[in-house]
């Protein structure tokens, strides 16, 4: 039998020698090159809409929000802003062409300053321009300081499916320290009406507030839980740059006291049947915010309106 000799064939242009090592994950320049990463599918898509006006700029707020102070109490330029939002969305359509939107979040500012008729037109424009899922979650942020008895129901009729109420606290002294325009009684009335008008809603609560004790924090939380909300967002007060609080820092609880507050929050929300599913959000079964989850799971979102931004994925 003839001996078998190993034969190596080098095709023209073929690389000789061992295969090169794959670039390290930290080589951002490499991985950002078009075509380097191929997506087998795209994540869910959400829509964020920013309405920038509020009655009063809170001293801790670093969002793109602006007090509406017009001579003679002139009304908000609702129609002009809605025209601009529609144009913004139309200009963005090539970025999301054909993709379905599974959640909408209308934030601010104070979106509840806009009339229910304006919100109705806004959502009509959205439905006319994008593929909105039939069961899409549509959240509107509301301030108890803009609460009127029939207003929340009118937002529901306009197509809003979920209300997020910026309560922050039920304690009048703490609300005053935060620069809020509502008091505890208004907050309670707003929550009661939201529970009547909506199948699901969220309460925003803050802790580690100026002058707040552990007992104060627990009282706020027990009041909130007394309304049996399906969802609560609980935020530690943060002193952000370029805010009034950054320029004039208030006296806030020590870190150990704030940790004790968080431990109590975790205990009380768990006992009330609210499961923590992200850093600041607690929900009953079936009431997690799809919009929040999409953010935390690195989904896609298109932002329209003053100061809004987007995060979008493309196949290549």
Pin down the residues of each PLM region.
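C-terminal scaffold of the Radical SAM
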Residues: 35-46, 64-316
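A residue-identity detector for tryptophan
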Residues: 11, 25, 31, 53, ...
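Local cysteine-cluster metal-coordination motifs and their immediate loop/turn environment
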Residues: 50-65
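Intrinsically disordered regions, especially transient/low-confidence alpha-helical propensity segments
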Residues: 8, 22, 28, 50, ...
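Flexible, acidic/Gly-rich N-terminal and inter-domain linker regions that tether
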Residues: 1-48, 55
């Amino acid at each position: 039998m003839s001996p078998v000799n190993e034969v190596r064939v080098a095709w023209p242009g073929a690389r000789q020698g061992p295969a090169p090592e794959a670039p390290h994950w930290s080589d951002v320049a490499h991985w950002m090159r078009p075509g380097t990463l191929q997506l087998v599918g795209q994540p869910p898509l959400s829509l964020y809409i920013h309405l920038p006006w509020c009655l009063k700029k809170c001293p801790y707020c670093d969002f793109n929000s602006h007090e509406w102070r017009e001579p003679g109490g002139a009304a908000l330029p609702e129609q002009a802003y809605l025209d601009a939002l529609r144009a913004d969305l139309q200009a963005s359509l090539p970025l999301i062409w054909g993709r379905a939107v599974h959640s909408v979040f209308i934030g601010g500012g104070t979106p509840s300053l806009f009339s229910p008729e304006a919100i109705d037109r806004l959502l009509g424009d959205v439905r006319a321009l994008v593929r909105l899922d039939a069961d899409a979650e549509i959240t509107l942020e509301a301030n108890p300081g803009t609460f009127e008895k029939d207003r929340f129901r009118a937002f529901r009729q306009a197509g809003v499916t979920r209300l997020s109420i910026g309560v922050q606290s039920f304690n009048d002294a703490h609300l005053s320290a935060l620069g809020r325009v509502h008091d505890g009684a208004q907050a309670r009335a707003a929550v009661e009406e939201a529970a009547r008008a909506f199948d699901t809603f969220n309460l925003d609560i803050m802790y580690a507030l100026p002058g707040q004790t552990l007992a104060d924090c627990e009282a706020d939380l027990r009041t909130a839980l007394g309304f049996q909300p399906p969802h609560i967002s609980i935020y530690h007060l943060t002193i952000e740059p370029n805010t009034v609080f950054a320029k004039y820092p208030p006296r806030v609880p020590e870190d150990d006291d704030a940790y004790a507050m968080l431990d109590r929050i975790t205990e009380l929300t768990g006992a009330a049947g609210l499961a923590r599913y992200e850093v600041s959000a607690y929900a009953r079964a079936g009431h997690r915010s799809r919009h929040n989850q999409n953010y935390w799971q690195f989904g896609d979102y298109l932002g329209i309106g003053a100061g809004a931004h987007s995060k979008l994925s493309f196949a290549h």
